[in-house]
Structures are given as structure tokens and as C-alpha cells.
Amino acid sequence: MNKIKPGRKIPGRVDPCRIVARLKNSGTLVNLAGNYDYLSSGYYLSQDRENSGHIIRPTCKEMLDAYVPPLFLEKARLAGILVPEYYISNGYFESPVIVDPINPFTLKGRVILKSGKARTIAKSLTRNYTYAICCQEIPACGKIKYFRSVLGWSVSPKYRELSNIVWEVFDIPLARVRVICTANGECLLSDISPLFIEDLGVREIRYVQEHVSWDN
């Protein structure tokens, strides 16, 4: 996928500083910060607009639903989206598994395919067994894949339907989406993480330009 490199000029390139736009189809404000983690600048941006009485996507509540692993998985499941089997633990898990921290001090999860270092990893991710972790079971022959979701669209046709679901269910405009692809061809929605405007490829930027407008 082509990315815009520093110094390369693209006609009509999106300015990463202009992160609040309006959806052309509805006029609703959209937060294009890319990182919607709790207490991030993107979180405060939506909070300020909400406190001013504006409707903006995503809301602070929607950010929490999307960025807290068990909330994300349960919301997806209730919406009829395929997700992996998962459980919450304070240290114990069986491989192969994806382990995501729930605590606000540890952001990066781990993929554990063998049980050799499971105890050490569990101790680290739980901050010495203080915080819980969300454990997603990896099915036999399952493969972990990633795609980028931009306003419900993906460069890859394979993931466009799932990208649209992420947008419609979670209201997250920009996201790096993790899925587990099973042996029978199913894609299990697993996680979403930040994706910034400045990291978008040329086709992704053009898609943004086609679907949003700026007030100035």
C-alpha cells in the first residue's frame, strides 16, 4: 500500500491538523483524530464538542466501547458480528491465545502461541496480577490479520463489509482492525487500535476527501 512520504505533495492532501470535519451525507461532525483512547487528545476533542451540544462521531462512550477489549467484543457479539471465544482472567490463560490488557497503564497486548513464557507474560500484562486481562482463543489453524478501516471502507475488497460494520456499530472513523481468519474462511473481529490521518495511503486520503468537508 502506498503511503505519503515526507515532502511528497499530493493534490488536496488532508491536513492532519484539521481533524474535525463534517460528513457530507449527514452534516454530522466527525472526529478524525485517529486515536480514541481514554483521555487522549481525540477523547477530549469529542468531549468538548459534546459539552457544547454538538453531535459528533464517535462520542466518548463509543470510544470506551471500542477501546476496552471485553466491551468491544461483547458489543460486537450483541450486534451479531462473529468474534472469537474470550474470557477475562487475572493471570491464567491457555495458548494459543491473544492477551489484551484491560488496565489503563498497559496498551499493547501479546499473541501467545506456546505456553513456555505464559506465566512471565501474564505477570507483566496484569502488573503483577493486579489488573485483569482479556484472553481471546485462537482457533486451530487460525491466522491473525490486520486491515485499515477508513470511514467504513477498506482498500482491500476482502475487508470492506467488515470495515463498514466497524463504522456503523462502533462509530470509529479511523482504525487498524485486527481479525482472526479461521480455516473455513470466517473473519472473527478481534480488536481495533489507532490509525492516524498522516499514516493513510493515497487512496485512503482520497476516500476521506470524498466523504467529508471542512467548515473553513
Locate the predicted segments by residue.
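C-terminal active-site "lid" helix and adjoining low-complexity regulatory extension at the edge
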Residues: 171-172, 181-216
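A short glycine-rich, hydrophobically flanked beta-strand micro-motif that places a catalytic Asp/Glu
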Residues: 132-138, 144, 172-184
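A conserved acidic, glycine/proline-rich C-terminal tail/linker
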Residues: 161-170, 174-176
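Active-site flanking residues adjacent to catalytic metal/cofactor-binding acidic residues
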Residues: 99, 177-179, 190
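Active-site nucleotide/adenylate-binding loops and adjacent lid/helix of ATP-dependent enzymes
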Residues: 1-164, 209-216
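Hydrophobic residues on conserved beta-strands that form the core of alpha/beta folds
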Residues: 83, 174-176, 189
